[in-house]
Amino acid sequence: MENVKKTDPTIFSWIEEEWKRQEEGIELIASENFASRAVMEAQGSVLTNKYAEGYPGRRYYGGCQFVDKVEELAISRVKELFNADHANVQPHSGASANMGVYLAALKPGDTVLGMSLDHGGHLTHGSPVNISGKYFNFHHYGILEDTGKIDFDKVRELAKEHKPKMIVAGASAYPRIIDFATFREIADEVGAYLMVDMAHIAGLVAAGLHPNPVPYADFVTTTTHKTLRGPRGGVVLCKEEYKKEIDKAMFPGLQGGPLMHVIASKAVSFQEALSSEFKNYQKQVIKNASVLADELNNLGYDLVAGGSDNHLMLVDLQKKGVTGKKAERVLDDVHITVNKNAVPNDPEGPFVTSGLRLGTPAVTTRGFAEDEIKEVAQLLDKVITGLEDQENLEKCKKQVTDLCHRFPLYRQ
């Protein structure tokens, strides 16, 4: 970073501050992770200089012989990782990947069935404030109040009533295994496409620890960060019959030039994800989430769906008399990063909320195992139950710092 320091000391100083925040804080945001040095180095390479509109062997610019090899390798690796017929690695984000599928398979005004945002879905699954909800006629399913699991009877009922062109499965705050076979069954009953957004669980799927949606879905989208631990970006996987439509939708339909430095970084992360070490890492992610959920249950917290089968959990704070916004802010003060999150039937608005979403991918990358996770659960409880006790918060902050110093990230 010496060149950044010399050229732009202001930006360098903020990068240093962000490094310090990551190094000295406990990261529990479920959608965040720590990329390897190799992933970051590929993203910071000379490939950032190259324009490459089009696809390997079919570019609109010369000089693409090497970036063609990079993109071909990224495609080959991600297809192997998920046993997919076809992959498009050009989406700049998960949202871009989702919009690419919609553009390929739908027309404006088409009816789509997706998971409600306040029941664990995502903005791009038809929220009225998102382009998906403005361009398409979305209807939403949710979870059962007693179990917190997807209400498949309601999914089937809505599908038969509205005859959607597409059903979207996948979530951003759902802690249980998703039954893709039942989604496929319902989609077939009404003649709908099935799209699965596996952004949150892609790493678990790659490791064989969550059912793979690829055999069931017509289209699968994912981010490449989160549990995959790559750079920020997206991917679309699809059956061979949809290859042409997907590629045409991503370029020239939705995007211009691909980010070749990011695609190189994706390729590196896919190589990492094919390793046995990555599978062991994902096993620990799930163990840590299970331990954290159990510890919080034992401390008297209400968890949506009662616990976790994957990398995340949703904590309902209503019985604790604390809003998600307040808990997030005070936890941030002691260097524990979480995100406030709506819970089902939340009486609070989206900027306040009654819950927290917690995840274990980042702390597991750091090296935390069961003992450290138990300590984290105790810290969460001490902060949430002692929000106004400044002495308590200072002690918690020191405990967080000491714990993080035992597990350094990028600088030994």
From Swiss-Prot:
**One GO BP annotation of this record:** glycine biosynthetic process from serine
Q: Listed GO cellular component terms? A: cytosol
Metabolic or biological pathway, per its Swiss-Prot or TrEMBL entry: One-carbon metabolism; tetrahydrofolate interconversion; Amino-acid biosynthesis; glycine biosynthesis; glycine from L-serine: step 1/1
Name the major location: cytoplasm
One MF term in the entry's GO annotations: glycine hydroxymethyltransferase activity
- What's a Pfam family in this record? SHMT
Positions contributing to (6S)-5,6,7,8-tetrahydrofolate binding: 117, 121-123
Q: Which InterPro entries match?
A: PyrdxlP-dep_Trfase, PyrdxlP-dep_Trfase_major, PyrdxlP-dep_Trfase_small, Ser_HO-MeTrfase, Ser_HO-MeTrfase-like, Ser_HO-MeTrfase_PLP_BS, SHMT-like_dom
Identify which top EC class this enzyme belongs to.
transferase
Give the intrachain disulfide bonds.
none
Protein's cellular compartments: Cytoplasm
As stated in the Swiss-Prot or TrEMBL entry, residues carrying the post-translational modification N6-(pyridoxal phosphate)lysine are: 226
This chain's protein is named Serine hydroxymethyltransferase
Q: Which organism is it from?
A: Natranaerobius thermophilus (strain ATCC BAA-1301 / DSM 18059 / JW/NM-WN-LF)
